[in-house]
Amino acid sequence: MWNDEDNNPYGSFERRDSFASSTNPASPTARDYSIDARFPTPQDVRYDAPLTPSDAGDDEVPGPTYPREASDAATDDETDDQAHGELVPRRKPGGYDSRIEQMLYENPELPILITEAGKSQESGGRFIVYTIKTGDLTVRRRYSEFASLRDALTRLHPTLVIPPIPEKHTMADYAANPTNAKQDQQIIDLRKRMLAVFLNRCRRMEQVRTDGVWWRFLDPNSSWTEVLHSHPVSSIPKQIMKAPPLDPANPTAGHSFLPVPSSSAKLKTLPTQALDSAAAASLARFPPDANSLSEQDLDAYFIAFETSIKDLESLLTGPMEKVNRRTLNHLSSLASDLSELGARYNAFALSETAPTVSAAIERVGQAADSSYIATEELSTSLSASFAEPMRESAQFAGVVRNVLRYRILKRVQQEMTTDELNKKKALLESLERSEAEARRIDQYLSSSQQIQPPRREPPAQHRRDGSGEDTASIDSDFPPTHSDFSQAPSAKIGAPERTGGSPSHKKAASTSITNKIFGPIRHAVQGVVDVDPERTRRDTIGKTRESIVQLEQAQIASAKDVKDASASVLKDLKRFQREKEDDLKRYMLAYAKSQIEWAKKNQETWEEAKAEVNKINES
């Protein structure tokens, strides 16, 4: 139950298992039409109880049934059975890891409800938490945890159209209400409705329901932080393009060698020129047999689908949104005017003395009051059952474009891998030709040296010895006294050997200075100039061969990724198209139902007022 201290509707929970309603009676969620316009009433819902003992009382009222959608992992026969409501409870082979998993597996149509929204007692009342009820199990999650769940699902299933969640607070919200923007009751009620829709849409997706992450979000015994830091979420590569599309948490060795295209990369060759709206409309929405078409042929269908989605998004976020907002504002203004008009008629009736006239005027005032209430309900009903789903459809358009963009990036990645592999093969061929040419030249030079050995000059020592002998023979012709001049003078013995050692010292000093100045330059030049081109060429050949082996693995992985991504995206787009058509049908019916109910209420009250006014003439 709520702590109503200070009249705070967001008071903290007094106990964790509390299910008392905290909904503001004036909010849209407290009205029957907000659920009826989208889903049946809770009394109309029946589902099989889980096969495990129930922890809650038998007086729990199950939640509303959401529209049934065919599972994208089911066969054609299973899809037909689901469409006719013939889905029967089933058992999972191998057992269950959690009670919530058993409930969802055996009762795939079990609705998920968000019953409450309020400040969390554990966080000191700083955060708004949403109470999620699945059968008889409840768990509380913050909006940021919903956002992290959706982010994890988009990384785990990049080829699936994961439903959107309500947007975060905008800067305009904080500017308009800087202190209580996060506690705005209308925004909280909106999030309650749309987050429940998000969870139930995920429930109808077979891959999401069985990936081991989504149902842990609903498990009260699971720590969401631990789930995000454990397999499979933690095993997904940081760069999603280096992971397989159907199982990103288990990439192969070849995926680590894949190049990563930029987010704005485009295909080199498009199948046709950019399709406009008319050309996209003339093309069939989906290919008749995707298995017999190449990736280039499938590109045209994906481009046509993306064009139609862009047109839908521009329509929903442009004229439709403006007209919707203007209509709701007019209805709110009309309701205020009717409220004031009813008050004026009631005051006027008190001043009238004639009983019949006074009663007639009072009845007109009551009719105006009734019209005020009906118009206010109509405005809120259209906002909840029509305007909000239209905004969600616009968000879906952005999600679809991201999924199609992922497939395009996979195609670009395949082209980049093929181009890089061709470049490496051409480089290897060039290096091998250079190596063969160098070996041929070495072999030719070796054979030439064996046939005509070059003439060898006498060694330098031999020449010096010969010159010494000649000098000795010349000196022998002179008297010995002439040899005294060849000796050093006597002054050389006593004098320091400064003159003899000075040139060598100067030369060494100049050499060290030169090394300091030109050493780094010489080192840099040696780094640029290949001192051993043959060894460098052999090393380059080895590295190139290794790169080719890696790129061949990457090419195999990329080809499989593109094929799997195209098949999975096409399959999920078909599911999304069926769901979108059903949603639009439901939105239009909800719009018509709201208008009919509003008109019936007004007709009934004003006919009663007319009958009361006619009594004046009779009297």
Swiss-Prot record:
Disordered: region residues: 1-95, 444-510
Record domain PX: where: 108-224
InterPro entries: AH/BAR_dom_sf, PX_dom, PX_dom_sf, PX_Snx41/Atg20, Sorting_Nexin_Autophagy, Vps5_C
Stretches with biased composition (Basic and acidic residues): 454-467
Compartments where found: Endosome membrane; Endomembrane system
Membrane topology: Peripheral membrane protein
One MF term in the entry's GO annotations: phosphatidylinositol-3-phosphate binding
Domain comment as written in the entry: The PX domain binds phosphatidylinositol 3-phosphate which is necessary for peripheral membrane localization to the perivacuolar punctate structures.
PANTHER family to which the protein is assigned, alphabetical: SORTING NEXIN-41
Protein name in the entry: Sorting nexin-41
Origin species: Neurospora crassa (strain ATCC 24698 / 74-OR23-1A / CBS 708.71 / DSM 1257 / FGSC 987)
